[in-house]
A protein has these predicted regions:
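C-terminal beta-barrel architecture of Gram-negative outer-membrane proteins
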Residues: 122-125, 140-184, 190, 200, ...
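C-terminal beta-signal and adjacent terminal beta-strands/loops
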Residues: 185-256
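Gram-negative outer-membrane beta-barrel transporters
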Residues: 93-159
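Outer-membrane beta-barrel translocator domains and adjoining extracellular loop/strand segments
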Residues: 21-29, 34-36, 67, 72-81, ...
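Transmembrane beta-strands of outer-membrane beta-barrel pores
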Residues: 12-18, 28, 57-59, 66-72, ...
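Residues on the lipid-exposed face of transmembrane beta-strands in outer-membrane beta-barrel proteins
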Residues: 1-3, 12, 51-57, 100-106, ...
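Repeated loop/turn-to-beta-strand initiation elements of outer-membrane beta-barrel proteins
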Residues: 5-8, 59-64, 109-116, 150-156, ...
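Outer-membrane beta-barrel signature, preferentially recognizing the C-terminal barrel domain
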Residues: 16-65, 69-70, 86-98, 220-225
């Protein structure tokens, strides 16, 4: 193993984040018949400690990140009145988060290139009224580039995300598939890019929350499939002018 082939970096950072003016407000805002939002004038700044390790070897990479947040500011939903939920920020002890990412690039000649990645994350949270103190989840992703010819490329990208914990909310599993074609024509002067993102429209906003005296099931189903067409053309230099190129002072005098 050569020193150039292997690279590693270890870093640590600490920063203090102060609450925003919106989080410090004392009043309540009406968001919907079932949701009020408010601030908290007693909020304290949160301190974030972060330790990261990044390693690379040829076409493989590894990234590990550990974060501990002291007095973390978290927007916690509570029961305000019958069938009315109140969103209000508060400081909550020391919460810890760990994430791991592994990636690998694989080539099959000049025809097929695949970038594989696996992400794992877990958290340890202590919030009053929160039923889950620990939660984890993972994601698998594969980005494929297929060269059909020197002027045509096909992109097929897929991802799968397991059910996971994200803060106070539980996110259900999801998957998606994106496909695209890129054409380079007329001596690479004309470029046409066609893309269909989320082909099967599977990326919907869903999450659930189980807390003290309150349970929330959020679901937003809508059309997430999108189409993109991008066309570009490189124009030649339409304005060509002959410039005088003199080499001596006499040439310049003659030109004048």
């Amino acid at each position: 193993m050569s020193k150039k082939a292997f690279q590693s970096q270890l870093s640590y950072s600490m920063k203090t984040e102060y609450p925003t003016y919106n989080q410090l407000r004392a009043g309540l805002n009406y968001s919907s018949p079932y949701l009020y939002e408010g601030g908290n004038p007693d909020l304290r700044p949160e301190t974030r400690h972060e330790l990261s390790l990044l390693s690379r070897y040829m076409k493989s990479s590894l990234m590990i990140n550990y974060t501990a947040v002291v007095d973390q500011i978290i927007q916690v939903p509570t029961l305000y009145a019958d069938n009315i939920m109140l969103y209000r920020p508060d400081n909550h002890g020391v919460n810890k988060y760990l994430s791991l990412s592994i990636s690998q690039r694989v080539n099959w000649g000049d025809f097929w290139e695949c970038a594989l990645r696996m992400d794992y994350q877990t958290q340890w949270m202590r919030v009053a009224g929160f039923t889950r103190e620990r939660g984890d989840g993972y994601m698998l992703k594969a980005d494929n580039t297929i060269s059909l010819s020197n002027h045509v490329q096909c992109f097929v990208n897929g991802a799968y995300r397991s059910a996971s914990e994200n803060g106070l909310f539980r996110i259900p599993r999801a998957w998606n598939l994106d496909v695209a074609l890129n054409f380079s024509l007329l001596s690479d002067r004309l470029n046409i890019y066609l893309e269909c993102a989320d082909v099967f429209s599977t990326l919907h906003g869903k999450r659930t929350y189980d807390g003290e005296h309150i349970t929330m099931d959020y679901s937003r189903n809508y059309q997430t499939r999108t189409f993109t067409i991008y066309v570009s053309y490189k124009l030649s230099n339409l304005i060509s002018s002959k410039k005088y190129k003199g080499n001596t002072t006499n040439d310049e005098i003659k030109r004048l």
